[in-house]
Amino acid sequence: MRASPCISQPAASWHPRPSALRPTAGSGPDTRTPGTVEDGSAPCPAFRSPAVSPCGEEPCCFQISPAEETLELGRLVSPGNCDTLSPRAAGFYACHVRSLIPCRSTKGRWPLTASAAGLSSFSG
């Protein structure tokens, strides 16, 4: 039995490829349009608290909340994994394919903290 994707988005045009799930920072100029499904990106609503639905085995979306916390499955992870829109402009952030990794692979790999203060070192 397959679990549903974490994100509540129509998945008709969102097909992350396994080869695209690896980090690609610095691979070249970024010509994508945040908030669209072009080139495998998908818009994600910003979570306002860590209380998000648990995830199955589908790829999950990382997003940064208005409090500048990066949330994934209700846990805080490195904000370096997200491409963001202006938090005040549309109220949501764009998570691209490179920010989507299988849920199980995050276990024990990312720094967890209870507040955004612990993530300040990642802002650069």
Curated annotation (Swiss-Prot):
It is found in: Cytoplasm; Nucleus. Keywords: Cytoplasm, Nucleus. GO terms for cellular component: cytoplasm; nucleus. Strongly expressed in testis. Weakly expressed in heart, placenta and skeletal muscle. It comes from the Eukaryota. Residues 1-42 are annotated as: Disordered. Induction: By p53/TP53. Residues 1-11 have a biased composition (Polar residues). May play a significant role in p53/TP53-mediating signaling pathway. This is TP53-target gene 3 protein. The gene is TP53TG3.
